[in-house]
Regions:
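A generic structural motif
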Residues: 58-60, 189, 388
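Short helix/loop capping segments that flank catalytic or ligand/cofactor-binding pockets
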Residues: 8, 109, 147-150, 193, ...
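Substrate-binding groove of N-acetylhexosamine-processing glycoside hydrolases
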Residues: 32-35, 40-42, 48-50, 123-126, ...
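Bacterial N-terminal signal peptides
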Residues: 8-17
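Bacterial N-terminal signal peptides that target proteins for export
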Residues: 1-9
Length: 701
């Protein structure tokens, strides 16, 4: 018997009551994310006092202290109380209220919880038991990981009630439905997060029981073997990776290296020294025809693998569009493109076999050749991906399961190429994909964020990322409305629906665009010059959606400015919501103002003999504080807001490639201001106006 177990009779039997039996039950709506598997709410509550302490078993004090610290921080943030964290030796029969964090290896903990109806069977290494009443508050698990997850649930249970911080009386038995619940961050196409921000990502995700964090890398790791590839001013260094892995380990998060080994390698292959191994000159695909390709893969992973102690390596392999159109053309014509692809993946697996890791690969290309999937080693893990709001995803999971391969499903957080994430699409995509993955035996979920156009601000992704975490933990089809109902409390520690309402207002832009059948990515819409024929036509179409888009954005902004203080956790993410709202408003403004500018100028042009009318029309277009100035001003303002958002998360590297887009758009508006003022001066001198089309005013009312 371990010595640490000796304190348990004190904890479980001698603890003094902290509330009288007459105390009315709090019985709040729990609003927990993820939702536990089994929950019973009882009468009463455990009150946290200034004298309450957090007790961890002495034998596990080192490992379990991180869980205790997250709980102590939560209690301090909610109540101002600073609780001590102690082990068995500090217990010493002191009659004070105690929050006990225990391991189920102690038979007395197990027996006590069983006496309260909480069985320890079937919860595994990641599950936990949680019990509270007027006199007890206990979290117990088989492992430190399970205990950590139980504490994260406890943090959400704590509420203010009548000036006191309490935990409602509950019995909870909980465990994950999927072993691996992951999030991937694309750190290769533009923004590269700072080490501090990556730690923050991991810390927040761990609160919601995420245990896998993928770094999607194409060319951004500082490879000793390939010194030309990574941008030295921002490359991920071995020192940063070591720090990240060590930090994540304490939070039970495994860092997953995702280093491409086939496609998406343009930033390597654009250099002349790699021309021999490019499928097509300076292209994207590493050719399988050259042995040097495998030497490069071997060398890259020799640099990477020692830094990542987890069980997986993700070798990519998606979107190999050039394959068969360059050096592999003859081979593909001979044996078929599918065999060329799958033989390469097989050889990559063999090349990396000495590391004794399980290899993941993206499932889009191999899926085209289900009859050939037997070529792949059975220890590889397929990662099928799809980001649409489809009713079913079984068709892209089942072929891999039928071939005897393990599967991790990859939905998307809908952050890329968008002014603000399409939350409605993201929720449905994640819900259905994870549901079908569980049905077909997938071992996990890897919820993806991407940076296709290099603009995505990660802080906008939290709603869909947290929903993905919940869906992976919960069983079957997760309820979107229940998630929305819980999100204010579980993420912001806000007791009403303020931020749910703001998020739904932000999604009105996507809904308005869908109603007019515009499915162009909203970043592209934002950058369109409205004074070109193409841009004018698009603005004319968008004008029907603009009022709804702007009303949603402006209602969200009013609420965020008024109610920011309601966010008692993660308040800084409201700034990212604010940026998203202003970008929506600017897009709607551009659509509306383009219409109005065209209308006024055409009216002036068609009534050139009426000087007063012409003067009034031109005043609407380009006077001080008129519409063209408004478009320029909102663009330059957004440039500054975007810059600040970027630097909160990312290294300065690549930022200028986004800011130049703001500069170019603002410059176009400034040019139009100058041209319109010149037209006004011309009218004053000659009583004639430049034809509208020459100024870029193509929309004749």
């Amino acid at each position: 018997m371990k010595k640490a177990a000796s304190f348990l009779p004190v904890v479980l039997l001698l603890m003094i009551p902290v509330l009288s039996a007459e105390t009315p039950a709090s019985n709040p709506e729990l609003k927990l994310i993820p939702e536990p598997k089994e929950v019973q709410v009882h009468s009463g509550s455990f009150r946290v006092r200034g004298t309450t302490r957090i007790l961890v078993e002495f034998g596990h004090q080192s490992e379990d202290r991180i869980a205790a610290e997250t709980l102590a921080e939560e209690i301090h943030d909610q109540s101002g109380l600073k609780l001590s964290i102690t082990g068995e030796k500090a217990q010493a029969k002191q009659e004070r209220s105690t929050i006990t964090l225990a391991r189920l290896e102690d038979s007395r903990v197990k027996e006590f919880l069983e006496s309260k109806g909480l069985r320890a069977d079937s919860i595994g290494d990641q599950g936990y038991l949680l019990f509270s009443d007027n006199t007890h508050l206990i979290v117990a698990a088989n492992t430190g990981q399970g205990l950590f997850y139980g504490v994260q649930t406890l943090r959400q249970l704590l509420r203010e009630d009548g000036g006191n911080l309490v935990c409602p009386a509950v019995s909870i038995r909980d465990w994950p439905s999927m072993e691996w619940r992951g999030v991937q961050d694309d750190v290769s196409r533009g923004p590269i997060p700072t080490e501090d921000y990556m730690k923050r990502q991991i810390r927040i995700l761990a609160e919601y029981k995420v245990n896998l964090f993928g770094l999607y890398m194409e060319h951004v790791f500082d490879f000793a073997s390939q010194p030309l590839v990574a941008p030295k001013e921002a490359a991920l260094t071995p020192q940063e990776i070591n720090a990240l892995v060590d930090y994540a380990k304490k939070l039970y998060v495994t860092i997953l290296p995702e280093q491409q080994t086939f496609g998406h390698l343009h930033h390597m292959l654009k250099y002349e020294i790699y021309s021999e191994v490019a499928e097509r000159p300076h292209g994207h695909v590493l050719t399988p025809t050259k042995e040097r390709s495998y030497d490069i893969i071997k060398a890259m992973y020799a640099d990477l693998v020692p830094l990542f102690p987890g069980p997986f390596l993700h070798v990519g392999g998606d979107e190999t569009f050039e394959l068969g159109h360059g050096q592999t053309a003859a081979r593909a014509a001979d044996v078929g493109l599918g065999r060329v692809y799958l033989e390469h993946m097989q050889k990559v697996n063999a090349t990396l076999q000495p590391y004794h890791k399980q290899l993941m690969f993206w499932g889009d290309i191999a899926l085209k050749y289900p009859q050939l999937l037997g070529i792949l080693p059975k220890d590889m893990i397929a990662v099928p991906w799809d980001y649409d709001a489809k009713p079913s995803f079984e068709s892209i999971i089942k072929p891999y399961r039928d071939a005897g391969l393990l599967v991790i499903v990859a939905p998307g957080a809908q952050t890329w190429n968008q002014l603000w994430p399409n939350l409605d699409t993201g929720y449905v995509n994640i819900r259905n994909f994870v549901r079908d993955g569980q049905k077909l035996g997938a071992i996990g979920v890897l919820n993806t964020t991407w940076n296709d156009d290099g603009e995505a601000i990660y802080g906008m992704a939290w709603p869909t990322l947290i929903f993905g975490a919940a869906a992976g933990w919960q069983a079957g089809e997760s309820n979107i409305d229940q998630f929305k109902d819980a999100y204010d409390w579980a993420f912001y520690r806000n007791g009403d629906a303020t931020f749910r309402d703001a998020l739904e207002n932000l999604d009105r832009g996507h809904q308005a665009l869908a109603k007019i059948n515009v499915h162009t990515e909203t970043d592209d819409l934002f950058w369109i010059d409205p004074f070109t024929p193409e841009g004018a036509n698009m603005m004319q179409k968008l004008a029907a959606a603009a009022p709804e888009m702007r009303l949603g954005a402006e209602h969200a902004l009013e609420s965020l400015y008024r109610n920011a203080a309601k966010a008692h956790a993660h308040q800084d993410t409201l700034t990212d919501m604010t940026l998203g709202a202003w970008r929506w408003d600017a897009l709607g403004m551009k659509a509306e103002f383009t219409q109005e500018i065209n209308k006024f100028y055409w009216d002036a042009f068609q009534n050139q003999t009426d000087a007063d009318r012409v003067g009034n029309d031109l005043e609407e277009i380009t006077a001080i504080n008129a519409r063209l100035e408004d478009l320029r001003d909102v663009t330059t303002r957004l440039s500054q807001m975007y810059r600040e958002a970027w630097l909160r998360e990312y290294n300065p590297f690549w930022l200028d490639n986004v800011l130049v887009r703001y500069d170019d758009l603002a410059r176009e508006f400034q040019k139009k201001i100058v041209a319109a003022r010149q037209a006004r001066r011309q009218y004053s001198a000659t009583k004639t106006l430049t034809p509208p089309q020459e100024l870029g005013f193509y929309l004749q009312p």
